[in-house]
Amino acid sequence: MKKLLISACFLVMANIAFAQEITLDKIYSGYYRGKGISGIASLKDGENYAVIEREGIVKYSYKTTQKVGTLVEGGFESYTFSDDESKILLQKESEPIYRHSFLGKFDVKDLKSGKIISLNNGNFVQEPKFSPDAAKVAFVVDNNLYYQDLASGKITQITTDGKKNSIINGIGDWV
């Protein structure tokens, strides 16, 4: 019983000694938020990762934490690798629609050839996704589904019945 009382007193004293004032300013300013790295992607080789930085998308080694090279130069808001990591979808610009949805302008860079292709002729799209073979990218414009063949640049419309706040093809929505 004596040990329990001493332990309880110790915990109370430690709590008082290390107490911090919690304020709304600290909560909303991110004071208590953990530090992290945004825009990081682990590469399939298991030895490297990519990070978005001011100079572009930079490749680093896990083992040495040293820069291995720059995959794409320039400023981008975000990026996504194709499944085989042969291409990168680069988000250049965004325009919010609702709380979690946005329109964006995207380019696709072929990492082997260095060729850059603008998605949808440089116009805004939603939800772009690579095909499994990275030969095409599907996307949504005005609630209709499209895909673009990356080799030819040809854009094919899949649906035609999209309608704002009514028929929303290719985008998840609240019911």
Predicted regions and their residues:
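Sec-dependent N-terminal signal peptides
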Residues: L4-M13
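Beta-propeller folds
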Residues: A17-V175
